[in-house]
Amino acid sequence: MENFQYSVQLSDQDWAEFSATADECGLLQAGLASGDELLSSDIDQGDSSGSSPPRAPPLPTGQLAAGGRSRRGCEEEDVATQQPVSRSQGEPVLALGTGQQTPSTSARAEAPPSLGPGASPPSQFSSCPGPASSGDQMQRLLQGPAPRPPGEPPGSPKSPGHSTGSQRPPDSPGAPPRSPSRKKRRAVGAKGGGHTGASASAQTGSPLLPAASPETAKLMAKAGQEELGPGPAGAPEPGPRSPVQEDRPGPGLGLSTPVPVTEQGTDQIRTPRRAKLHTVSTTVWEALPDVSRAKSDMAVSTPASEPQPDRDMAVSTPASEPQSDRDMAVSTPASEPQPDTDMAVSTPASEPQPDRDMAVSIPASKPQSDTAVSTPASEPQSSVALSTPISKPQLDTDVAVSTPASKHGLDVALPTAGPVAKLEVASSPPVSEAVPRMTESSGLVSTPVPRADAAGLAWPPTRRAGPDVVEMEAVVSEPSAGAPGCCSGAPALGLTQVPRKKKVRFSVAGPSPNKPGSGQASARPSAPQTATGAHGGPGAWEAVAVGPRPHQPRILKHLPRPPPSAVTRVGPGSSFAVTLPEAYEFFFCDTIEENEEAEAAAAGQDPAGVQWPDMCEFFFPDVGAQRSRRRGSPEPLPRADPVPAPIPGDPVPISIPEVYEHFFFGEDRLEGVLGPAVPLPLQALEPPRSASEGAGPGTPLKPAVVERLHLALRRAGELRGPVPSFAFSQNDMCLVFVAFATWAVRTSDPHTPDAWKTALLANVGTISAIRYFRRQVGQGRRSHSPSPSS
């Protein structure tokens, strides 16, 4: 990991600068380059630019010093440790501006990674702070690593990430060799914590700051005080630095209190950090103007940073100057990461912080920077207001610092985007408290307006929101709303910009939470949002997704509604309305039934006896037969009379099979009849009768029907008297066949493949016919010859 940190984002020029700085600081390059060969982590990191010479001394340190990182003497060592970490992780970035602006971004990304791996992040805001053991690790990094850096390899520090971090940033101006060692540790911790964080450092630069917002805010406050008081090079109290955990958060701002909270861990942070946040809020309130200015600078450095410039942006690039102060300097290369680290340290989310950085970088690293930058402890609110998605995460981080779950949720949420962060913020109890001022956080979903509200209303509500969060948020509110420089302006811009970027996106998801009004109201709504997707970005997204799902059921409900209308048509359709498919089927089934009913009604209106015969008449030309039938027996009319009543009911479907049977029975009865026309009409007449019989009076009508059938058959036989004359004799058949054969041969194409078949059949048939005729002729002659003779 150490090599990875060194190699990450470090160009040859950066390495050269780092070597020079290392020489100046008396830092041993060998120690910094404990891992000369690139590690698989470097390759995995995919940092082509970071393929720095294995032992090249951490350029970030020199860069940090050059970038006006001159902090406080010993305090800057701690800060330098933080800075080196961020720089080591963002060396390429360091080149941008004294290695602070860009390095700060990269350091942020890297610092969260170190947090992710579990390197205990010192409360120094070193980018490599561990996830939860912030206090112990910070102390180790600050105290133990201090002597170690000059001679020990980066791996020697507590966590390789931390040692690397301290090695990398050895360039911090005015920082003793011990400071570089701490930087190596932190840089290593940051890189080891998450090379992914380094890769996403550019994006997560500001986002990381959100993660470290509480402590970053503290550093920012310190940096602001240093800038305002001693200036960028002004060294804040080294004493607080040594307790970096507290001092770093705010040497002059009282941020030191929040820092120990960060060290204490998520749980500790919840209780002490909130109190510390309150202290920070007070200190930050004072130093926040400075921090705000530094943040403003940072905001200049990055668009999103402006909203977040307070902490994250200041930490990130432009703010590196404001951050050049001990806290800010620490923030610059690693200050953001370090604040993130502090944030991470403050909460187990420290590890998630890399994720957060990643997520923040993806959704809105700028907003997150705002979150982190806006205020160390109070900035969380500003951050929230500024970096809606990230800012929430930051506030959540701060608030989440109060609750590790919240921070972890933020981490998850940050990867997803602003919305998740919002949900995360809501999820944590502190978040809910912070949400009031974090209306932005809650309003992350409803970004623009809620944030503005959060910036303004949320801050007083922030204090209302929760004792811990209130304190922190109170600080935030003042830095955001009243903080001079960037605080007053940047928060508004941050709110405006962040809403544009992400809050607007998620405004749909969570406008209602923000709308509730004051920050507290927003916080409470955001908490429900978090509840929906409470512990994690995914959950938040799921909660958001849940809304659309109800809408889909609504759509389904609307779809079923039409079926009820269709059901009303039939009557039992109400049951079909239950489901869309059933309704669909019901429509069609209903239509079919209606058609059948209409047909039945029409059949009932027209006499069945007349209807079927008419149909048969159309098909068969036995009109005379039917007429005779009707004339001979007026029964058809009676038949029609009984038929109409039954037809509307069962007769229609039942009559069809009966009619079919009657057709066949009629043929059997008419076996002797040659003409098919008569039986068909008779049968046609029969079906209505049978139908009528089946309808009800069928039993008594059966005999009558039989009689009628017999009469019809008789009459048909009489009528057929002329029909037998039409019967073809063999002679006629032969003539017809000859005629057909002649026609077939003449009309067929002889060239077709099957022409021979036609010719063969025609010839054979014709020959047979001719032979037949000849026999007939011979017989005729024979018959005629005797008669004349006789």
UniProtKB/Swiss-Prot annotation:
Q: Where is this region: Disordered?
A: 38-391, 425-449, 507-545, 626-648
Compartment(s): Cytoplasm; Nucleus
Where are stretches of biased composition, namely Pro residues? Answer: 146-157, 170-179, 635-648
State the GO CC annotations: cytoplasm; nucleus
> As annotated in Swiss-Prot or TrEMBL, what is the tissue specificity of this protein?
Muscle-specific expression is increased by endurance exercise.
Low complexity bias: start-end ranges: 40-52, 111-123, 158-169
Composition bias (Polar residues) maps to: 80-89, 98-107, 366-391, 515-532
The alphabetical list of record keywords is: Cytoplasm, Nucleus, Transcription, Transcription regulation
Q: What does this protein do?
A: Regulates the expression of selective PPARGC1A/B and ESRRA/B/G target genes with roles in glucose and lipid metabolism, energy transfer, contractile function, muscle mitochondrial biogenesis and oxidative capacity. Required for the efficient induction of MT-CO2, MT-CO3, COX4I1, TFB1M, TFB2M, POLRMT and SIRT3 by PPARGC1A. Positively regulates the PPARGC1A/ESRRG-induced expression of CKMT2, TNNI3 and SLC2A4 and negatively regulates the PPARGC1A/ESRRG-induced expression of PDK4.
Q: Tell me the protein's name.
A: PGC-1 and ERR-induced regulator in muscle protein 1
